[in-house]
Amino acid sequence: MKANKYLIFILGALGGLLYGYDNGVISGALLFIHKDIPLNSTTEGIVVSSMLIGAIVGAGSSGPLADKLGRRRLVMLIAIVFIIGALILAASTNLALLIIGRLIIGLAVGGSMSTVPVYLSEMAPTEYRGSLGSLNQLMITIGILAAYLVNYAFADIEGWRWMLGLAVVPSVILLVGIYFMPESPRWLLENRNEEAARQVMKITYDDSEIDKELKEMKEINAISESTWTVIKSPWLGRILIVGCIFAIFQQFIGINAVIFYSSSIFAKAGLGEAASILGSVGIGTINVLVTIVAIFVVDKIDRKKLLVGGNIGMIASLLIMAILIWTIGIASSAWIIIVCLSLFIVFFGISWGPVLWVMLPELFPMRARGAATGISALVLNIGTLIVSLFFPILSDALSTEWVFLIFAFIGVLAMIFVIKFLPETRGRSLEEIEYELRERTGARTE
């Protein structure tokens, strides 16, 4: 691929950075919000989970919008929504405004989760699709780390408004940057604009590959089914179920319990407020570094092998952490918790973190890719909502180690699911994957 065109993918993936920032920033901001706006454990859970309720709506609506408006224009709209939500949060003076701001941010987060991976996948040449698709996850981890660093920087002045409001900066960069980016060539071809699709492909593809790729795209488009006909068809229904289960397993393994409540977990272990936030910075740094490694291996190692290997590592980390907390006690095991959470992040960041966002768009056909990815993202957000809402409740009711054991058991189920139900997609064009899945499920391809 032409090296100077990576800017397209970096700017396209900025939506992932905003998703990560708004996921990560709340863990530090919660330590100080309650000093200005009274919060108890219930209202704290509502503030955290309200973003996820918005994300469910955003993910569910953005899929059809991405297919109708185009990937690029929808990302521009998402950036505007991010800006509005961040400004409301920064200006919040009561619980209601906090919840409204988080709901609006959630709309943008849900839209970003379903639209950005599709845009990156459809723009990328086959041999680089895994690496470039992983840019979305890398940006998510950079956003989380940026949130932790901002939290630490403003901890001394208890500046939670700055923590929440600074999301405006990358939102404006995304809005301006995506304005100058091209539309997905597959969306252009789907909307009968072959010449524009060819011009875009000249930017990201080698010239020798363009005719072959366009031929495959047109053959798939020749299957005369509308978006909703494809979505309602039995063959896609089976694939959509696989995609949704894949998405919800990523959350039920417990990653966002770590992201949302990392500062609170460290505080419970006996660290001070600033030290708890600094511990989260370390977690975020590891997340970024291991995702960079994933970018270089995701197109060299089969996707399923990465997922299974990551599962084994995450399960081991959770089990060790649970046993040590059980035997030593959470107040006496702060550094053990940091080490175990770090290992958990390493194994997640090399596997389920990037691979989910690479594979989801790969599983679905062109005519329904935006809508089907949106539905999967909606289900993922429901899973995130359940985890974030019930983790502190279960942690108090059952103790933290039992919650980690539950996550480990779910990790075993996730590994079985990957082995039995997920197809391998590495090294194959999106059109080749669609042909195979149609044949495996008995759908016509003529």
Curated annotation (Swiss-Prot):
InterPro entries according to UniProt: MFS_dom, MFS_sugar_transport-like, MFS_trans_sf, Myo-inositol_Transporter, Sugar/inositol_transpt, Sugar_transporter_CS, XylE-like
Cellular localization per UniProt: Cell membrane
Impact after mutating I105S: Affects symport activity. May function as an uniporter
Membrane-protein topology: Multi-pass membrane protein
Impact after mutating Q137A: Loss of transport activity
Extracellular domain ranges by topology: 32-38, 91-94, 153-154, 270-272, 325-329, 400-401
GO cellular component, one term: plasma membrane
Key word Membrane present: yes
Molecular function GO labels: symporter activity
Pfam families: Sugar_tr
Effect of E122A: Loss of transport activity
Source domain of life: Bacteria
Regulation: Inhibited by carbonyl cyanide m-chlorophenylhydrazone (CCCP) and by the human glucose transport inhibitors cytochalasin B, phloretin, and forskolin.
Segments traversing the membrane: 7-31, 39-64, 71-90, 95-122, 130-152, 155-180, 235-269, 273-295, 304-324, 330-363, 371-399, 402-420
Outcome of substituting Q251A: Loss of transport activity
Alphabetical keyword list: Cell membrane, Membrane, Sugar transport, Symport, Transmembrane, Transmembrane helix, Transport
Effect of Q250A: Loss of transport activity
Important for symport activity, annotated site positions: D22, I105
Cytoplasmic face of the membrane: 1-6, 65-70, 123-129, 181-234, 296-303, 364-370, 421-446
Cited NCBIfam families: SP (TIGR00879)
Stated role: Transporter highly specific for glucose uptake.
Family, similarity comment: Belongs to the major facilitator superfamily. Sugar transporter (TC 2.A.1.1) family.
Protein's recorded name: Glucose transporter GlcP
Organism phylogeny: Bacteria, Bacillati, Bacillota, Bacilli, Bacillales
